[in-house]
Amino acid sequence: MSKTSIPKNYHDLLGLYDTQRAIGIIKTIFQEKLCAALHLKRVTAPLFVLNDSGLNDDLNGVERPVSFDVPCLDERAEVVHSLAKWKRYALAEYGFRPGQGLVTDMNAIRRDEELDNLHSIYVDQWDWEKVITAKDRTLPFLQETVRDIVDAVCSTADELRWKFPELKAIRLTREPTFITTQELEDLYPDLTPKERENAFTRAHGTVCIMQIGGQLKSGIRHDGRAPDYDDWTLNCDILFWHKALGCALELSSMGIRVDPAAMTRQLEAAGCPERAELPFHKMLLEGKLPLTMGGGIGQSRLCMLLLGKAHIGEVQVSLWDAETKAVCERAGVQLL
């Protein structure tokens, strides 16, 4: 059954032609602003990695990667879910220094994604990573970086409204409100994690929810996180209130990455200490990889947010079930 729902009073602010123009402008302007704010250089990234490299992102630990055999190598490869671990490896290989980082155009297939207004099996995002020092592994440093990203988003929105006056009603809150997952649970103890996100983002406009992955006092986790890239005490999601949909839109998942102590602790907590024997994990535990922070910023989601679109299929080409197509057609929503 389709989870797609188009609001009754929704209407597209831009036609197909201007939507394509705007998407190109957003991707150019935002990447420039992001690179300037975080001191990033664009690099070329892989679409797939070897199965046994340990470089793929396990996400919540249950999603199955798209896998295929490579006869000339006598190996199997898998399409990346994200580049969270590859980026850290690349920073070491390319000789980036503290304060410097990289950004890639990441394209992925997430075959097990449940389709709705915000989710597609095709994922496109800016995957970024930068080298930091031990003294940078703090919540204030994380928050400073979040503010830089939010400022880049809002400045892109400002330029877009100048080019497309039809978007004048789309306004974003430039100052993010920070809250931990435990504080959020304490504030809304009777709501589910997703309901808490919606309630808090509705109230504040732009929010940063920190410390995702570990168990809360209630015994549950706010959301899943793989144990081998983010430090669960130093990570976050950035959410904006999406006026057209009337819900929180998660634009970015990011964080300060695990050091050897945090990785060991989190692998044990997740019940998978054997991962420490994988090549990437061994390099990290042996101190051969730099300390880093990084994240992913959804390209299609940013376009949805800044263009006021009600469905992600209005800004990207993907595959949709018959019911989703029918719901969109009845509402006059044109899927690309």
What are these regions (language model features)?
Residues 104-195:
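Extended, charged alpha-beta segments that form solvent-exposed binding/catalytic grooves
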Residues 109, 179-336:
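A translation/RNA-centric and nucleic-acid-associated enzymatic feature enriched
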Residues 34-42, 149-160, 310:
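A generic secondary-structure signal for well-formed alpha-helical elements
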Residues 18-21, 25, 29, 137-144, ...:
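Generic recognition of stable, solvent-exposed alpha-helical segments in well-folded globular domains
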Residues 100-102, 123-127, 204-206, 246-248:
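Extracellular structured ligand-interaction cores
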Residues 47-51, 165-172, 321-325:
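A glycine-rich phosphate-binding loop feature that marks nucleotide/adenosyl-phosphate handling sites
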Residues 68-70, 92-98, 118-120, 169, ...:
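A general structural signal for short secondary-structure junctions and capping/turn motifs
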Residues 2-119, 127-131:
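Class II aminoacyl-tRNA synthetase-like tRNA-binding/catalytic domains
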